[in-house]
Amino acid sequence: DVPNGDEITLRQLADMSSGAPEYTTQAWIEDYVADPERAFTTEELIAYALAEPAQFAPGEKKVYTNTNTLLLGEVVAQEYDQPFDEVIIEHIIEPLGLTQTRYETAVDEWPGDHPTGYTLADNGEPEPEPNNFTVLGPAGAMTSTLGDMCQWATALGSGALLEADTQQTRLEGAPLDKGPEYDEYLVGMGSLEGWVGHTGEGFGHTVLVMHNPESGASVAIGMNISSLGKHVPTRYFRKIAPVVDAVPPA
């Protein structure tokens, strides 16, 4: 059972205030290092988290963990009575026409030409990372292009797929007590410099998608290196945002 599962709300999962522990525990690290090509199910990933105590009582703090998103993915799959990837395709990818975006469900499934992700070794040299997307599950097992990412940034930031009241609720937030760099974390997305969207990092890739609801501008940034001690796309975005904001609307 999820620690405090009888008290946690769906909103608390989405705004990172549930207290759910992170699934990337020492036990998970040991299992992954022993077999980097092992295919993990979402249930298996969640099980690593469930072996740990809750970080805090629901609603007490806001600490970002990918376990929250894994749990939401399971809720979505149960609600629609479909595998999570099928729900994403049917209700997001296809309606938005994201023809270059995929939810990856297998190890090394990324087809066609694509960048290799790198992390820095202890000696400072970049090392290529494998493409085991099953390690990420609903928390990040997707591939895309900058063009599609810009389209997604607009849809996410404007609430194109949601009722207006739902989108307004999603814009309510507060700073994280611990987690990725955001000015505030909202409901399933974050804010930076008055823009809303999300960042991500995994397997040597770092990304950012942001949308300005006032101007309608969207920005997507992707890099094929991580473990630099800071999220570089966020650093770039903070420099880019004032420039884009200064451009008069067309």
Residue ranges and their predicted role:
Residues P3-E7, R38-T42, K61-T69, A77, ...:
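Solvent-exposed, acidic/flexible segments
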Residues T9, T67-N68, Q100-A106, H114, ...:
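Mid-domain, small-residue-enriched loop/turn segments at the edges of structured enzyme/sensor domains
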Residues V2-T9, S18-T25, P95-T105, P175-E184:
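Secretory-pathway/luminal and periplasmic proteins that interact with or process carbohydrate-rich
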Residues E43-Q55, T119-T134:
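The feature captures the short pre-catalytic strand/loop hairpin that immediately precedes
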Residues D1-T65:
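Active-site-proximal loop and beta-strand segments within enzyme catalytic domains
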Residues D1, E79-V107, E163-Q168:
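Short, well-structured active-site flanking segments
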Residues E86-E90, E94, E127-A250:
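Catalytic loop of the DD-peptidase/beta-lactamase superfamily, centered on the K-T-G motif
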Residues L13, L50, V63-G97, D148-A155, ...:
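Alpha-helical scaffold elements that line and support the substrate/ligand-binding pocket
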